[in-house]
Curated annotation (Swiss-Prot):
This is Large ribosomal subunit protein uL29. The lineage of its organism: Bacteria, Bacillati, Cyanobacteriota, Cyanophyceae, Oscillatoriophycideae. One of its GO terms (biological process) is translation. NCBIfam families: L29. The gene is rpmC. Belongs to the universal ribosomal protein uL29 family. HAMAP family: Ribosomal_uL29. CDD domains: Ribosomal_L29_HIP (cd00427). InterPro entries: Ribosomal_protein_uL29, Ribosomal_uL29, Ribosomal_uL29_sf. GO terms for cellular component: cytosolic large ribosomal subunit. Keywords: Ribonucleoprotein, Ribosomal protein.
Amino acid sequence: MPFPKIAEVRELSDEEIANEIAKVKRELFDLRILKATGRIEKTHLFKHNRHRLAQLLTIEKERELAKNAEASTTVSTVENTQ
């Protein structure tokens, strides 16, 4: 099973990203429970889910920084015109 591509994550809306983050965190929690009880069969899912979570959090942070940069640019432009 190949890792998910980051291009797929970039196509998601902010709300979808937030939902996916919650979903992946829940899956990681469930995997840890299975590991603790000794019933886990697909140990590679830890790596895949951590990778997916990192992608989602990276895109979320990029968008947050872009919004902040845009807002600060707008504020500085307004201050310069006065």
